[in-house]
Amino acid sequence: MTLQFLSRVLPKLPKSDPLHQQVNQALDKCLAKLQNSQQQDGSWGGGSWAGVLQSSVGCSALEWAAAAGKTVDGTVLARARDHQKGNFNAETGRSSAPDSAGIELYAFAGSQRAAASEAGAARQLIEEAKENGILPADASCTVENLMTLGVDKPQANTLYKSYAQNMAQLEQLDNEQLLSGFGNNGGEEFLSYMLTSESLVLQGGNAWPKWKQKMNTRMAKIQIANGSWTGHHCITSPVFCTAAVIQCLTADRDEVLLRAINNQDASVKPERL
């Protein structure tokens, strides 16, 4: 999370600012620690109740760092994404993970977030091609159409699979049984909602406004009188929970940096990041 914070701060600091060098060095240090601590399966650690969320935050932190201009090991990023995306079953439309504590929401949000940038990149490429007359106005996102635009076949397959996954997951956003998570709200639920918010901004389309309204209504009902939110299981810290809720409700304010993540997936192969 520190890496994500610093990645947001660095682009806003002019190089003449006294803090720029300190933030830049701290970001480099965090990025090195994160990349060096990844396990071979693409996850991080296992020292938490729902490790799938821990690994999801690690995966998205790599994306934030790349968007901030840092050189990210493409193998590490691809491994992190694949680990999370593998928790979604395309045949059943369900999500599960050994380290999700048996809660589908956590695996769902992590897999959705891991695929979101590639899904958004696929959408971006197809929409721009239609606007420029390269593809017909009714063209859909397919491997063949992506290859027509110059994307090599392996990358076209990756982008399309992520796009198809995210489109399938959109159908689950009204599933209250899924969204209820553990059954009452802990920091894990708020973090999952935040991951979905980022996913919807990344992948583009019309789903974000509807989701934002749903979350505004949901969070207003459980906000404490002092303006904070607190968890009722596991992660109970009002500081953590309130921060996650605020980011859940304001993900679109990070749209410029999130779009930078899209642009990288739309223009280069992961190993060249």
Model-derived features: where do they sit?
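Preference for long, amphipathic alpha-helical scaffolds in soluble/luminal domains
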Residues: M1-L273
